[in-house]
Amino acid sequence: MNIPYLVSLLSSACALIIGIVIHESAHALAAYALGDRTARSRGRVSPNPLNHIDPFGTVLLPLIMILAGGPVFAFAKPVPVYVNNLKNPRRDEVLISLAGPASNIVLACICALILRGMPGATLVSPLSSGVANLLVGFLFTAMSVNLSLAFFNLIPLPPLDGSSILVLFLKGRALQTYYEVQRYAMPILIVVLYVLPSVLHIDLLDWYFGVTVDPLFLGLLRFALGA
């Protein structure tokens, strides 16, 4: 049994579950604040992961991707929003969509603040022994996972939040074309995440994270370490 690998996997899984719960609860809270009580009445503002987990998107799909050895992504149950209850439906849908990724970025910043306040905190492996070292390693992992979760969800393909945001800026034929493309969202994601890197050695996700997640993570890392 590969204990170090299991510890690392458990740390990442815990960070991902926490990130997903915060992400989905933020959607529900934003909807409630903007006039729609549906998600809150259905228990979506809750720390209980079972209220947010989608059996396929949160459990089965990530397991398949881990076994396949490629990038891993997951999605939770969609937060129910009835646009007729919103004060300004077109604007509020975008704000609700942005609330999820924004909450993950805030959570990553909170992790950095906690690390900054920990005496003698240094960049350690999440596999290091000792409770303090395990906590430090987990916080660094949580920073990375939450930033990745935030920016991955901003990709403009359903069921990701970026799809709802992009619609605000499209009109006419462009909007119609986008709705047609949405039907092929999952095949497109599979091509981008697996086919292009393995066949053509073109890793669009790595490039995208390189210009979004990496600079922000390095900035938070310097802040956390007092560098």
Task: Annotate each language-model stretch with its function.
Residues 1-227:
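Hydrophobic transmembrane alpha-helices and their immediate loop junctions
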